[in-house]
Amino acid sequence: MSSNINIVEAPEGVTGEGFFATKLNDVVGLARANSMWPLPFATSCCGIEFMATMASHYDLARFGSERVSFSPRQADMLMVMGTISKKMAPILRQVYEQMAEPRWVIAVGACASSGGIFDTYSVLQGIDKVIPVDVYVPGCPPRPEQIVDGVMRLQELVKSESVRRRSSPEYQELLASYNIK
């Protein structure tokens, strides 16, 4: 993993090993990216693959997602896995709204991304109809390696995000387009 944080020699007269010269955005982004707490919202077979992803063989904890949260108020990464019916959509939205900022969403699998094989009146054809999605993980169901890759892509996005992006007019406009306050 590359980082924009550089360790340089201390100026003369300053004691110690050295000091960091970097931007606040880089430090906060690095800390956020490597300490994400996932909230699994699993309704189908992708949830089984998530269990394998969290197990010792794939070990998502290596990437800073060690503590799985089952409370939206303590999570910052919502992982939606499986089919979401239209009756379940308001619940998914409520879970998203209960998460504190900054919050990110990964749509895991074909069902969460586009409705999958369930092209019917009762199934939501992609969770991006009710909440904003940051990363899509394809597959039916996706292998644990793909889920890990999706988390790593989200980490890259988080690292590059400005500290103040979440209070920007563009982000507020995005939330307003979903009717989220």
Swiss-Prot record:
Cofactor(s) needed: [4Fe-4S] cluster
Subcellular location: Cell inner membrane
Binding residue positions for [4Fe-4S] cluster: 45-46, 111, 140
Catalytic activity: a quinone + NADH + 5 H(+)(in) = a quinol + NAD(+) + 4 H(+)(out)
This protein's UniProt keywords: 4Fe-4S, Cell inner membrane, Cell membrane, Iron, Iron-sulfur, Membrane, Metal-binding, NAD, Quinone, Translocase, Transport
Membrane-topology annotation of the record: Peripheral membrane protein
SUPFAM superfamilies, alphabetized: HydA/Nqo6-like
Enzyme class of the recorded protein, top EC level: translocase
Pfam families listed in its UniProt record: Oxidored_q6
InterPro entries in the record: NADH_UbQ_OxRdtase-like_20kDa, NADH_UQ_OxRdtase_20Kd_su
EC number: 7.1.1.-
Record GO cellular component, one term: respiratory chain complex I
Cofactor stoichiometry and binding remark: Binds 1 [4Fe-4S] cluster.
GO MF terms held by the record: 4 iron, 4 sulfur cluster binding; iron ion binding; NADH dehydrogenase (ubiquinone) activity; NADH:ubiquinone reductase (non-electrogenic) activity; quinone binding
Gene Ontology terms: biological process: aerobic respiration; electron transport coupled proton transport
Disulfide bonds, paired cysteine numbers: none
Similarity remark: Belongs to the complex I 20 kDa subunit family.
Function recorded in the entry: NDH-1 shuttles electrons from NADH, via FMN and iron-sulfur (Fe-S) centers, to quinones in the respiratory chain. The immediate electron acceptor for the enzyme in this species is believed to be a menaquinone. Couples the redox reaction to proton translocation (for every two electrons transferred, four hydrogen ions are translocated across the cytoplasmic membrane), and thus conserves the redox energy in a proton gradient.
Record's subunit section: NDH-1 is composed of 14 different subunits. Subunits NuoB, C, D, E, F, and G constitute the peripheral sector of the complex.
Official protein name in the record: NADH-quinone oxidoreductase subunit B
Organism, scientific name: Flavobacterium psychrophilum (strain ATCC 49511 / DSM 21280 / CIP 103535 / JIP02/86)
Gene that encodes the chain: nuoB
